Amino acid sequence: MTNADNELEPRLITETGLDQRLADIIEPVLVGMGFRLIRVRMLNQNGMTMQVMAERNDGTMTVQDCEEVSMAISPVLDVEDPIDKEYHLEVSSPGIDRPMVRKSDFVRWQGHLVKCETSIMIGNRKRFRGKIVEADADGFTLERDQIAYGEEPKVSIPFTALSDAKLILTDDLIRDALRADKLAKAQAANQNEADEQE
């Protein structure tokens, strides 16, 4: 999947209510800057806080990127004025134990632990935890790490049933996330050098 494909890939898990209105305002700005929206939430902490999670199409997000995104979406939010109270704007990367919101997230993080919830019962459960062993266009398969008596060790979860999913922090995940970040930074540096030579 190319960065252009990633840019256009829809999110499986989206917001509702006010959070959806905020996402509708913010997402076009992010896409225009080469970023993807992961999640937006209004939280009641330290007064009202609007939490925006985003990343570049290659999966990276620096502190400088967070500043740029904040500076770009702040004036748009001021004009649209979707919130009638004072709030703090917090822009961040999704982090290592990130929310899984696109099909490509399940492909990218195959082999890692995830916990998820479904909107329907699958094998008498709605909550699952396990290693992603396979992902395709329709869903993903988990190898459970906590099996109840009588349950199959693997469970297939269709993307249409997914209501929430998040990576679980492990040493392997930290190692692979750092490796992916290092590779993305090296590729960006090489691209910058090539652009300067032209």
Swiss-Prot record:
Keywords: Cytoplasm, Ribosome biogenesis. Gene3D superfamilies: Ribosome maturation factor RimP, C-terminal domain, RimP-like superfamily, N-terminal. One of its GO terms (cellular component) is cytosol. InterPro entries: Ribosome_maturation_RimP, RimP_C, RimP_C_sf, RimP_N, RimP_N_sf. Coiled coil: none annotated. Its main location: cytoplasm. The keyword Mitochondrion does not apply. One of its GO terms (biological process) is ribosomal small subunit assembly. Transmembrane segments: none annotated. Belongs to the RimP family. Required for maturation of 30S ribosomal subunits. This is Ribosome maturation factor RimP. The gene is rimP.
